[in-house]
Amino acid sequence: MELGRAGPAGLLLLLLLLLAAQAAPERDPYRVLGVGRSSSQADIKKAYKRLARQWHPDKNKDPGAEDKFIQISKAYEILSNEEKRANFDRYGDAGESQGYSQHQQRQFHHFHEGFYFDESFFHFPFNSERRDTSDEKYLLHFSHYINEIVPDSFKKPYLIKITSDWCFSCIHIEPVWKEVAQELEALGVGIGVVHAGYERRLAHHLGAHSTPSILGLINGKITFFHSAVVRENLRQFVENLLPGNLVEKITDKNYIRFLSNWKKENKPHVLLFDHMPVVPLLYKLTAFAYRDYLSFGYVYVGLRGTEELSSQYNINVYTPTLMIFKEHIDKPADVAQARDMKKQLIDDFLSQNKFLMAARLTNQRLFQELCPVKKSHRQRKHCVVLLTGEGDKFADAYEAFLTFAVANTKDTLRFAHIYNDRQPEFADALLMDEEKYRGKSAVVILERRNNAGKIAYKTLEEAWQGSNEDNFILLDLLDQLRTDPGLLSSETVLADLNDELAPMFLIRWFYSTLDYILDCWDSLFHSNWREMMPLLSLLFSALFILFGTVIVQAFSDSSDTRDSPASEKKDTTAKTEKNDTSFNKESNSRVPKKGFVEVTELTDINYNSNLVRLRPGHMNVVLILSNSTKTALLQKFALEVYTFTGSSSLHFSFLSLDKHREWLEYLLEFAQDAAPIPNQYDKHFLERDYTGYVLALNGHKKYFCLFKPHRSGDEGGTLGACEDYDSSLHTEARGKSSCSPGSRSLKNKLHKLSFWMERLLEGSLQRFYIPSWPALD
């Protein structure tokens, strides 16, 4: 009896186990991708790409392809994440958090590892497999978005929703989204849905870091929707994406100007007459799609000031009327009228009237569309082109050609004209005898053979004047062409046409700059702050460094001003009385390391170490003195250079003029502006006084800078004044001085040496180069 009772229960349990075992492989990501548990990330990625290409719903029409593709995507999502993969290997579940402790999981894992419960049993809408079927046809993938959606956004705007699984807010906006998507799609707006769980790369590319998100795409530019998700806000958002100058409001005052612009713009002009005060969104979307071919205007027939316009074209004010005007503005070239203007009706109407009756070839794209390359015999199209000029001289020929084009409209014929002076290469290639057609118009019948520019053509033998005879000749050739395509016997290759209507470089640059500024402004206030943080960090860092430098410099200058009196007290009284400006320079120099100046004599013993083999970047400042002036000049020299002793690259020495006069005069020969050096026949040879000269010697680069004592009148002509002084820097009045040593104290010979040292450190002194250092005997 007990066995009988246990029999059905056992069979049910066995059946459940079999079903679970059968479903287990479908839930195992390794089996779904066909890889082993020890496979590397490269192998997993390779397997995913292969299976994704095989089971992609766009390529595989199998009814179960979408479910299989979702399983593949889920499996790759688990195995591509090391943490989820480790959880699955350990617990059979890819979740990041477990409901029980690891001990409990180990205890019960063996029991439940074969059981899988599908949440669809409870009809929860969170599983991607159970998402609304209305979204499935709008699903976007990264390659599809880049290759198709972005280029198509230059023809129509796109409204894109980013969603994910387990998103309660996504469920909340779903009814509104479905209604608006259906409504806007009928008007010509592109609709897209991105599942952030399976298209993480695309979601990141779009800048969507949370779900749900709604964004607009137009001209390749992304704009996020930030208002409440209601029908009116979404419609207004799409309308705001469109440029504001697509449709011009037309009244009795401006309709003639608007329609007459066909010649300047080289486009037909479209007018919509309606009793709605606001331009319909459908009309704006149509204007955006056809903006390269047509110009659009809107007439609100209920507005005062449109009576003349409505009366002239016999408009029914109760029915929307669409009119298209070409070369003649007194009457429309075509009319469409319907109580309910549908997108398909408008598209069919405009696609048949995209070009003027005899459009001017202003760029290569227009030429290729007017005269397409034949793909089959039935699609053969011949272009009749008038090569003419500008001005009243050619007006009659053009009007006659236009009349002929209007009277002979056929699907296989396209009429166009071109200005010879604006497209000289085109005209020269078709008119072999330029002298024959100089100052006249010519007609050419041509057929494009390939996209490389090869054409077959025939030029009318006589110039086009628009006479009846010319019309008969052209009409006869066109009739022959229908039966004998070989009539176009000449062939040539045409270069691409110049773009006559392209804006100037400055205008393009201005608009590009304006768009960039507007994008930055929009990004600053509406973009995700996570993306803006690097830019903001860089900006604030630059501002901090800039203002920090200014503040530190300001405090440094103020502290130097306060400290300068204390520095002056430490120096000698004689220095303070002589030159206050010199002290200001010294206070800003490097702080001396010692309380004295170490000055060594330059002799033949230390000559190599102190000059010839001096380290790169080091200089030896040498004072020239004699035995009689040694004490006074050394004291003054030490006082002048004291503030520069803190520099480790400067060395200080003195040279005895009595011992090494020839060495000094050899160096002075290389000083271009130095005083003439006497020779041995000069009676004043031994009377030249070089005491007080200072030479800054760079032993490594073999050059020196020269300081000469400040001289006055007589001797100044012989020895030369020190050109290294900048009189604009020192405006302190000086008394007249004699060049004779007896008339002026020796200590004044080194006057302003400190300023010369400043310029030496700045590198602004003149340099005198020598081939090699002479020996110091």
UniProtKB/Swiss-Prot annotation:
SUPFAM superfamilies: Chaperone J-domain (SSF46565), Thioredoxin-like (SSF52833). The chain crosses the membrane at residues 532-552. One of its GO terms (cellular component) is endoplasmic reticulum membrane. It is a single-pass type IV membrane protein. Residues 558-589 are annotated as: Disordered. Glycans are attached at N627. It comes from the Eukaryota. This is DnaJ homolog subfamily C member 16. It comes from Gallus gallus. The gene is DNAJC16.
